[in-house]
Swiss-Prot record:
One of its GO terms (molecular function) is ATP binding. PROSITE patterns: ATPASE_E1_E2 (PS00154), HMA_1 (PS01047), HMA_2 (PS50846). This is Copper-transporting ATPase. GO terms for cellular component: plasma membrane. Residues 1-83, 145-151, 216-343, 398-685, 736-745 are cytoplasmic. InterPro entries: ATPase_P-typ_cyto_dom_N (IPR023299), ATPase_P-typ_P_site (IPR018303), ATPase_P-typ_TM_dom_sf (IPR023298), ATPase_P-typ_transduc_dom_A_sf (IPR008250), HAD-like_sf (IPR036412), HAD_sf (IPR023214), Heavy-metal-associated_CS (IPR017969), HMA_dom (IPR006121). Mg(2+) binds at D631, D635. The chain crosses the membrane at residues 84-104, 125-144, 152-172, 195-215, 344-366, 380-397, 686-705, 717-735. It comes from Helicobacter pylori (Campylobacter pylori).
Amino acid sequence: MKESFYIEGMTCTACSSGIERSLGRKSFVKKIEVNLLNKSANIEFNENETNLDEIFKLIEKLGYSPKKTLAEEKKEFFSPNVKLALAVIFTLFVVYLSMGAMLSPSLLPKSLLAIDNHSNFLNACLQLIGTLIVMHWGRDFYIQGFKALWHRQPNMSSLIAIGTSAALISSLWQLYLVYTDHYTDQWSYGHYYFESVCVILMFVMVGKRIENVSKDKALDAMQALMKNAPKTALKIQNDQQIEVLVDSIVVGDILKVLPGTLIAVDGEIIEGEGELDESMLSGEALPVYKKVGDKVFSGTFNSHTSFLMKATQNNKNSTLSQIVEMIHNAQSSKAEISRLADKVSSVFVPSVIAIAILAFVVWLIIAPKPDFWWNFGIALEVFVSVLVISCPCALGLATLMSILVANQKASSLGLFFKDAKSLEKARLVNTIVFDKTGTLTNGKPVVKSVHSKIELLELLSLANSIEKSSEHVIAKGIVEYAKEHNAPLKEMSEVKVKTGFGISAKTDYQGTKEIIKVGNSEFFNPINTLEIQENGILVLVGRAINEKEDELLGAFVLEDLPKKGVKEHVAQIKNLGINTFLLSGDNRENVKKCALELGIDGYISNAKPQDKLNKIKELKEKGRIVMMVGDGLNDAPSLAMSDVAVVMAKGSDVSVQAADIVSFNNDIKSVYSAIKLSQATIKNIKENLFWAFCYNSVFIPLACGVLYKANIMLSPAIAGLAMSLSSVSVVLNSQRLRNFKIKDH
């Protein structure tokens, strides 16, 4: 059984990986993925052995709060920005008290100059008050940090909580010594760390605020798409307009769409017209004109006139619902490259605590001064610095932020990745297999030429009247051509469709009722022929003389034209060193012509679904990493077999289950965009990981005091600043993906 839920209380990747590790050990858990940024979790478990309530109890024991849905955050009296501002103000106040006299004695009143026991004690008490206020604004670090430590799942908050608490306790002890006059020399006289506690918390809070703002911006961009779902719609029932819940709409319902409203479900216009903003699907800002017979999709915006539409999908199966599901999966899943960071994070925090304790003991022993309290002060500074400077967040954010921003960028390009692994794998593709009809071509054959043995208008009238009864794309092409030439309609009876061959009907022909047939050559037993040398889709029109003989009256030659810009985009793909293949069920001449025209390396014609499947198997057996690009319908087996499946979606025709990547642009450029975005994302992740590993590898030893003899020691305050800058640098580097652009050549 698969379930999705949310977990509150996580602060860094050590939290999320700790939950995964703890639950992953359970025999009834098959798979679990926890995402730190959007607080989501996906789990697959054996429902015969446990249930979701039991899993929630296990997570609660670890110190976190699992919930089926995320409750809206309660509005607090002080906003996060106000809290941060107050923390900064009181930190500056404490720093002023502790260091003002060092800059200039005139900066402090004489009563606070710490020149005697009384002024020292008064100054320290004011520092303590300011410190407690700053700690109050940063209390979440202590609540979450000590809770995680209690449950043996230490995280970044645990490091901050332990380090600053140790500094506070030491300062309180020094304050006691001053108050009781038990100090021994200048080193033990009022050696406080209140300013270190405040500065550490302030820098960490600033870093977290920048981190959260960046994360929220990326998540808000995604959630804005989800907000395109209207709650109600106007249903036409018994000639009355009734406002109904979108969830109650069923296929076939007639809905009225007013100007300035969102489309509730997928459907088809049956009366009126409109201009729709489909940017949430395609990324294109220009409105799209829609008329009777055109499809409209949920979540798109009707800007001007009102129209009537018939629902073709319910809310659950609508285009917007499928996009929301894909976004949720993409945000919640993890890329393979993140596994390394997770493995390191799982042992990182305990290792840092061990290193800090070891460094404390060593410095207590080897510190150069004979005085114990001076040595204790140096050892404590090293202990706090090691805890504070280590940055598990940078490791966790390295992949999560890049993938989050990349998915946001993809949606603006009309691309949706099924999960993080799809985003990661697209860059490795070295072979792309294209379907032809509807993928490389428009999927709407148009009449190229007409060959008639009877009067042309009569031939068009016969074909128009019969093909009007068919939904086939070829039939629509002939009907459109006949309309352009004002061909009249005839009355039809006894309409019969032979799937895959053609359609026949009885109609008036030269004053008598005749059976007229329209279809491919296999549909006829002709007693005469037509000499046609053109390549294209051949559709014959004839009269049935008897059951075994047909008289040909004429023929249409149609062609399915390549989409605009396809040739250039195929060339872009080939410039990446990728081999291209065209697999189509069309005849050899048409497929060959298309492949040559577009510059595709190889092709297979007359290909049935099994033939396409076998070709992809063959390519994979040769070690190729194959991307299949199709329409998601008759290509489903091939899409499932490929390493990366791309569906060129046409609204509700999209098959999310078969697709790794869905393009609502219905444009081959999106294939190139997906590959380039994948490359840029993985490069960005590697940059983040490199920085995170290098930072911790260099700065933790520095905090331990390895360069003491070179007079280089990091104070706890500087350590806090370095840790915050490390996380912020990873976040800001990930934001560079927002500026990702596709070059046209």
